[in-house]
């Protein structure tokens, strides 16, 4: 209590004046109403960004010092690394196919190939086909058997190739009302054998001119027709100008079999085709001459070819003058029409009124222009036009000599216009489209030659497991005499292939789904609808 009284007393005794500012009241008038608001805030980026301005100096400074390391151990030498190629898929050496079906007697294929080798390959291929059908009032049988043997040997300087081919075809179209009981007298048979050897040079030395040589000898129906062929291709560069020389010799011998009633005939011909290639104005030129010699005289034809790639790998144009030549033989006629008159070809024949086929050479020169255009990925279009004079243009004529109603060859000189188109497109990994068409126009009537031929197909591939290919074929009208024509033919076909595995697969082919039964040749009707089913096995 005493302390409190003392403290108050001291404060009263030591009072002093304190100076202070006298602040008067200020009047504030608000003329507008204040509306409080909060501004919108933008969202901040949750991911921080930064940039490093520090640069790493990658330069290095070093010096080389020579000294030996003293160690009490020895290092093991490393072996060189070995690079292995990808494993090659296994190949099967052999394949067997057999099938049969409606109006198809049998169809078979046997194939065998050697194992992979760098210097030796060989193989064999056999095919068999036969059918049987009964047109109204007739009976028809056909068969075709082929054998192909091949071998290829490769050494340091050359490639040697040898082939042996055998082709036997029979064709029977028998009138049921015929009084002849034995079919052999009405059956056409053509057995053809051909042996070929070729040598191809791998040397590119300037002093090596011969690039390849080919020799073959053939026989039809036991020396009823023989051909001996020898050809060579020589190349040489003269003053930086590539020169190519093709030499070809052919000897055709007919009716030389011992039982022939006709005198043997022989026709020899020799070809020389020198050509030079050069480039000018961005165009690739190939010029030359075709020199032909035979007993009828010497014929010379020009060869001019110009090739220009207007757009690299896209648009190619090719045009010029070309020579066409083909020797008509009994073999070529039989391939075109197996129902030709076959007198003197070593087979059973009725009657004594036979004749030899007139075998001539068809030749000519024509102007041509070809274009190839890549329209897009996996899409290509090709078109060509050609016009020229054809000497000895061959066409077949029906001749009924009392014993046989068959065909012989005839000739006419014509002016020919030929247009052709080809289109290929891979639409997807599953579907493709292929189409082609040929149109011909002649200034004279020719027999059994269509003006228009077309084909379109659409292969479907389902992962290589199932393959389907529908196709449509059209064959235009053909004159068989001066005023009459054979009707055009329209065929729809369907093929199916199911691959159960790489070893086993099944096949179904349906031909002529519209069951067209029109005449292929005058008085020779086509087979109509037919089909074949088969299986194949690889091992």
Summary of predicted features, one role per range:
Residues 75-80, 87-96, 100-147:
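Outer-membrane beta-barrel translocator/receptor signature
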Residues 91, 96-99, 284, 288-301, ...:
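Exposed, low-structure sequence patches enriched in small/polar residues
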Residues 114-133, 244-246, 261-292, 426-436, ...:
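Surface-exposed extracellular loop regions of Gram-negative outer-membrane beta-barrel proteins
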Residues 184-198, 211-281, 414:
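Outer-membrane beta-barrel transmembrane domain signature of Gram-negative proteins
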